[in-house]
């Protein structure tokens, strides 16, 4: 996805919106100022996605997955709404949404039979924020389908 592959990006976006629909999450997507973040309303089970985030950034799919994560985390809503300005930056709630989004995109990747064996390649291919690299390594290790030489770990 980091490569300019709009068809693949659009397929992932479609998957994520279908996932939201299947989980009773309403969504609004809009184009606004590139600096206006996406947000979620937990009580209403609704996400609002700025499709012009950083001028149509390849990270838009991760933004969608992240906002879905806010709704799906099952925790009591302590805020009126969740507004994400910087992935992995604010608090545990933002971090949990990042992790949910990472796992959701990984689930999609597996369904596509992408067969990533390197977490860094997965992150890059799906334009996931590099702040998620440590969590991606942990996720790959937990999944037991680890095959990367960088740290001398090889699992099959």
What kind of region is each of these model predictions?
Residues 1-156:
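Active-site hotspot residues in diverse enzymes, especially metal/ion-binding acidic/histidine motifs
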